[in-house]
């Protein structure tokens, strides 16, 4: 009721002033920010990419940098996107896995702990070699298909599930373990942070988290020669021959986005984590067919979903695209550049064209959540570039939207959780 009154009040205020209701597009190319890369002639992927729509808007926008990951926190997408959506991660972050579980429709009960379960690729098993000596080769097992991964998850449940724990299939390599009564305080190593390294020093501590460690080793034994993996090897693909557990947490609770801003908001994303944040914040969540969370995602489908959300009454649409992040993790420089170009051409351009055709005032904000440098193949906590565009005003922006041009504007926001309010205020005042 409070949210309805706030939404109605906004519309009444607009009517009395004879102005149109604002529409807001927030576009998140996950992990887009990077470092200069020799392969690109010393340019970053943002500098190398042909992105005319971003650059056109940035030239008329407020431009700056923002820190989405608070000091002392791990630079994960849950932390950064929570901040962008105005929720202070220092207060509300309970780990990414519970958010993913919510998105997957899992009914978490008291005492349940959600744990991310990656299907990963470890170096081939060598007779007599300790499990600890194996090397993390790929956190995504060559971006295994959901269908193949589902068969692996079923095998895990048949052999390792019991009354207290159960595995749930997610998308591609991203899955979930629900374990009632498990410890949620242990800080796990992230598989994407240890590519090329022996896993021994990164496994859960035997004394502090021995149950998790035992489950990981048992799961690996089950998957090593699974028919799915033998078939993948025969096709020249990496096997998903192990599981890696991380980011344990209990069910989160977020304030209502609608209560906070008086806006009916929709999330468009392929990633359970982002959809989970939206659901916990009372936002509408759209599932896009063919949205994979990588370079092969349905870019056009995401644009269509955003446009449909506006047509169906959404005031704000939050479009998250995972592709640049995955390319960073996989050290795929050319694909990272391509992903930025596809986001610009197939998502931002058509949604902007729709908004311009409607006659309503609107705002557009574009920023990555965190950097995912190709060189490092993992996230960093560095500030990221942003621009805020309002159809009602023309600011002195930048000719090309990049890390360097944004930093040169000397408009740094130290707290990403204040960014959304700043964007709305900028567009409406």
Describe each model-derived feature in a short phrase.
Residues 10-11:
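Short, low-complexity S/T/E/D/G/P-rich linear segments that nucleate or cap local secondary structure
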Residues 15-429:
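Feature captures the catalytic ectodomains and active-site-proximal regions of enzymes
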